[in-house]
């Protein structure tokens, strides 16, 4: 959204006058980012692997799985957007994915069902593009953005 502007009086004509502007995201902007993050995580949950590619969550087993795992989202992280230089960033936020997978013991062949939530953290960067659209890069909070 746009504001009506603020009048700044300078004491010297045609000279740069330093001002400090603190941008804040609109609720609409935060909602768009939240929807995009949720969509990204939903796409992660469709991958039937223990460590979904490019995703902030995964599950490790030392035994064998008997069928591809099934992921779902138990709790989406709540997005908080803050200014970051000329762009924006997503403050680290916690979420929970849910995994359901059968695991066969290499020791005795027994099978147990893993049906549990997996906690994870996301963060990210948001870049405003020249055409007015945004580019959102979601990362895992523990690993950093790079």
How would you label these PLM feature ranges?
Residues 2-23:
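Structured interaction patches on ligand/partner-binding surfaces of diverse proteins
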Residues 25-26, 77:
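Alpha-helix initiation/capping motif
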Residues 26-37:
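Solvent-exposed, acidic/flexible segments
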Residues 38-39, 43-146:
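Membrane-lipid interaction segments
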């Amino acid at each position: 959204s746009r504001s009506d502007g603020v009048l700044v009086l300078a004491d010297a004509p045609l000279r740069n006058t330093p001002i400090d502007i603190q941008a804040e995201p609109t609720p609409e902007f935060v909602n768009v980012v939240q929807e995009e993050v949720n969509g990204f995580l939903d796409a992660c949950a469709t991958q039937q692997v223990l460590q979904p590619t490019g995703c902030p969550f995964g599950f490790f087993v030392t035994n064998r799985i008997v069928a591809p795992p099934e992921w779902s989202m138990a709790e989406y992280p709540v997005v908080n957007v803050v200014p970051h230089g000329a762009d924006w960033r997503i403050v680290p936020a916690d979420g929970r994915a849910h995994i359901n997978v059968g695991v066969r013991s290499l020791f005795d062949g027994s099978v147990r069902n893993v049906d549990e939530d997996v906690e994870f953290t996301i963060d990210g960067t948001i870049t405003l593009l020249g055409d007015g659209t945004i580019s959102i890069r979601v990362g895992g909070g523990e690993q950093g953005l790079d």
